[in-house]
């Protein structure tokens, strides 16, 4: 538990399921106030709110698409209107879909780039704007991936979005460090989330993925949520401009870098 997170206001994009849901619940257990964001699945968002209530937390759900500028502006403003402030912005919303690079349409490319990279930029921009205007030493956390470092065949758009996120985060961290605003990435490896459920349900595919992880197991969303809580806390007060990989050592494993996966 991080005492200084109590009363902090945390906005998490794409938090009706997966990593976002785990982070929302973790911050609620830290007694932070949480803004749950969803694009279309209101029922799932409401389910997260119920789980937050069960742990004694306080939260609201705000609908919005991170690729739509006005939606992102509204998301941040909703946080301020409901809770009076914003302390932590977590740009978690993301997507992936496998397509051979030579067959990838511009629409395929743009959809992933707009969600993963432009969406994170818009969230970062709006949060930092509020921090600067109100002299708040806030924190931005962007959800990157091991694929900001590891090439990924069939996912050139995804890898490009995460590679771009790396330098975006480093640039924002450098630009706003003098104001005490911290900006960092989390780089998850293979995690048990709904997006991976079908793959990991297949014993052969699961074993293949586990063979590329030196620690030998697929991570849980709660392990990523723990990293986010630390980065948002004062325990990480001198940390900015990094990608903290939470991947069981996957980024160090040569067989993956040789093209497996």
UniProtKB/Swiss-Prot annotation:
EC number(s) on file: 1.1.1.47
Catalytic-site annotation from UniProt: 158 (proton acceptor)
Record-annotated disulphide pairs: none
Transmembrane segments: none
Binding sites annotated in the UniProt record for NADP(+): 11-35
GO biological process, one term: sporulation resulting in formation of a cellular spore
Oxidoreductase found in the keyword field: yes
Residues where substrate binds: 145
PANTHER family listed in its UniProt record: OXIDOREDUCTASE, SHORT-CHAIN DEHYDROGENASE/REDUCTASE FAMILY (AFU_ORTHOLOGUE AFUA_5G02870), SHORT-CHAIN DEHYDROGENASE_REDUCTASE FAMILY PROTEIN
Role of this protein: May play some role in spore germination.
Other remarks on this protein: Prefers NADP to NAD.
UniProt name for this protein: Glucose 1-dehydrogenase 1
Species in which this protein is naturally found: Priestia megaterium
